[in-house]
């Protein structure tokens, strides 16, 4: 699905260098089809890097996807130029009267911060409440999963004593589920989190269906039966070097982090890591766009009435 983005967005040239099909707004205007409208609430500090990662995964399908970037934190960013934020991001007030086919809420480095201490916690709650009536399907990633489980289901924050960092094996529980269609029986995906997601907790306190688990019994991928919300507790969008960059950052900060599990060849940080999760990440986002967004969203977004088969 060629993603439709502003002509000047840095991701255009970045992704074209990888031979990723990106359609600029000026070119897309000549195609007489309705693109899917996908809103990305980017909570990560390095916003340009995160844009590149998610846009790469949203790009590999035959329909247009019109991307809108959203920010809810008005504080000055230390990692993203103000000019970039002003040019390519909207505020919630700009879009609260609009409807969207899809919403992606990214992770955030807030695993050890209590929810009420998050500077934009009220805004997160506002967006999630708004999405119930204005978005066909929402995908939550990593920390956003923990936030959504608290807001939507009242589940208290669950925190690990040590950070889960590395590339872990997972297995699917429902081979015919639409979100895992085409998945191998077992697959690899990266994690980088303090948040804890015991599968038993999800089963006991929600009506969500767990579709894939880690080998240790943590929930990795789960969703509502009506396809309106989906959750992925890892980082399938990560680049090959992202975990290495996080590890070196923590080393330089004197945090004495563990070497990310199953990531560096021979467990040696001097060796160049390889992405072993890329096909899984692409298939996950393609399935979400197709089965959870495109197949149930109304043609006329002025009337939000997602329909199941």
Curated annotation (Swiss-Prot):
GO BP: any one term: L-methionine biosynthetic process from homoserine via O-succinyl-L-homoserine and cystathionine
One family name in Pfam for this protein: HTS
Localization per Swiss-Prot or TrEMBL: Cytoplasm
Gene Ontology MF term list: homoserine O-acetyltransferase activity; homoserine O-succinyltransferase activity
InterPro entries: Class_I_gatase-like, HST_MetA, MetA_family
Keywords, ordered alphabetically: Acyltransferase, Amino-acid biosynthesis, Cytoplasm, Methionine biosynthesis, Transferase
Site residues by UniProt (Important for acyl-CoA specificity): 111
Gene Ontology CC terms, in alphabetical order: cytoplasm
Active-site annotation: 142 (acyl-thioester intermediate), 235 (proton acceptor), 237
Catalytic activity: L-homoserine + succinyl-CoA = O-succinyl-L-homoserine + CoA
Pathway assigned to this chain's UniProt record: Amino-acid biosynthesis; L-methionine biosynthesis via de novo pathway; O-succinyl-L-homoserine from L-homoserine: step 1/1
The organism's place on the tree of life at top rank: Bacteria
EC number(s) per entry: 2.3.1.46
Top-tier EC class: transferase
Annotated positions for site Important for substrate specificity: 192
Binding site for substrate: 163, 192, 249
Subunit (UniProt): Homodimer.
Family (UniProt): Belongs to the MetA family.
Known role: Transfers a succinyl group from succinyl-CoA to L-homoserine, forming succinyl-L-homoserine.
The name this protein goes by in its record: Homoserine O-succinyltransferase
Organism: Shigella flexneri serotype 5b (strain 8401)
Gene: metAS
């Amino acid at each position: 699905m060629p993603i439709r983005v502003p002509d000047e967005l840095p991701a255009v040239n970045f992704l074209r260098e990888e031979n990723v099909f990106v359609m600029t707004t000026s070119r897309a205007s000549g195609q007489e089809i309705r693109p899917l409208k996908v809103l990305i609430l980017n909570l990560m500090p390095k916003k340009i890097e995160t844009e590149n990662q998610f846009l790469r995964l949203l790009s590999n399908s035959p329909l247009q996807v019109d991307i809108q970037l959203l920010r809810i934190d008005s504080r000055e960013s230390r990692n993203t130029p103000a000019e970039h934020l002003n040019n390519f991001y909207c505020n919630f007030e700009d879009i609260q009267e609009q409807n969207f086919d899809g919403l992606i809420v990214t992770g955030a480095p807030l695993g050890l911060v209590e929810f009420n201490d998050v500077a934009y916690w009220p805004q997160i709650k506002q967006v999630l409440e708004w999405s119930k009536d204005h978005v066909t399907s929402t995908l939550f990633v990593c920390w956003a999963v923990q936030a959504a489980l608290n807001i939507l289901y009242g589940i208290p924050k669950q925190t690990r004593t040590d950070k889960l960092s590395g590339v872990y094996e997972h297995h699917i529980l429902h081979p015919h589920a639409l979100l895992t269609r085409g998945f191998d029986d077992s697959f690899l995906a990266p994690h980088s989190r303090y948040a804890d997601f015991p599968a038993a907790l999800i089963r006991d306190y929600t009506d969500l269906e767990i579709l894939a688990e880690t080998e240790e019994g943590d929930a990795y991928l789960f969703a509502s039966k009506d396809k309106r919300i989906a959750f992925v507790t890892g980082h399938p969008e990560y680049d090959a070097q992202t975990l290495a960059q996080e590890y070196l950052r923590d080393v330089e900060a004197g945090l004495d982090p563990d070497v990310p599990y199953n990531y560096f060849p021979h467990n040696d940080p001097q060796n160049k890591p390889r992405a072993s999760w890329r096909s899984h990440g692409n298939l996950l986002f393609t399935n979400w766009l197709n089965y959870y967004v495109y197949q149930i969203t109304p043609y006329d977004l002025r009337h939000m009435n997602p329909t199941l088969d």
